[in-house]
A protein has these predicted regions:
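A polyanion-binding, active-site-adjacent surface
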Residues: 1-218
Length: 218
């Protein structure tokens, strides 16, 4: 299955109850050849309306952090562990809520092949829920952000603070953790680039060895 075929199939997903109230499936966007994938928890109201990940206030702060790190948004791939908005409708007006474990598990049918097709070198988990889903269940974001962890979907994974959390903290103090977000993005990007270079060198060495074995190098 191609990436676009997977995206098209996801648009009709009925695997959990989030499908009944969604406006759009927010599959993800960006460079599918990127060595770095950013993964949040799930779309909010603005994302549900537009079908694009991280385009609300938190997304705008993420864009600012990417720019501060010297990285164009279009050069990475951005998605979420859950592709549909999770909302509480009990008051008649939808309010964002955390996806349930069942909803998150249901969406792995899209996330796992999505990452399998992209084949990123590094995954940057945006926020604690993403890290708990993709790194380890007892992940502690304030203590373990910015560190390298093994990943079943990439060479390594790093987690950082969620822009929504930073926005809340900025109401209390100026930086609110924004500088940490920028630093973690830079670290993840630089690690991804190093891994790309390492793979390229490995392939070049392999080609030299094969050429020598075949007597065609000189």
């Amino acid at each position: 299955m191609t990436f676009e075929e997977l995206r098209a199939e996801a648009q009709g997903c009925l695997a959990c109850n989030l499908s009944s109230r969604r406006t759009n499936v927010v599959f993800g966007e960006g460079n599918i050849l990127s060595p770095l994938v950013l993964i949040g928890e799930g779309p909010g109201d603005t994302e549900d309306k537009t079908g694009r990940p991280f385009v609300g206030k938190a997304g705008q702060l993420l864009d600012k952090a990417l720019a501060e790190a010297g990285i164009e948004r279009s050069s990475v791939y951005i998605t979420n562990t859950v592709k549909c908005r999770a909302a509480d409708w009990s008051t008649g007006r939808p309010m964002n809520r955390a996806p349930t474990e069942e909803e998150t598990l249901a969406c792995r049918r899209w996330l796992v092949p999505q990452l399998g097709l992209i084949k990123p070198k590094v995954i940057l988990c945006i926020g604690a829920p993403s890290a708990k889903n993709l790194i380890k269940k007892n992940f502690m974001i304030t203590k373990e952000r910015g560190q390298y962890f093994p990943s079943e979907f990439a060479k390594t994974a790093i987690a950082t603070l969620h822009p929504a959390y930073i926005l809340r903290q900025q109401n209390i103090s100026g930086d609110g953790g924004f500088s940490l977000l920028v630093a973690d993005i830079q670290k993840a990007w630089e690690a991804a680039q190093r891994l790309v270079e390492k793979d390229a060198m490995g392939k070049a060495d392999k080609m030299v060895i094969e050429a020598e074995e075949q007597g065609t190098l000189f």
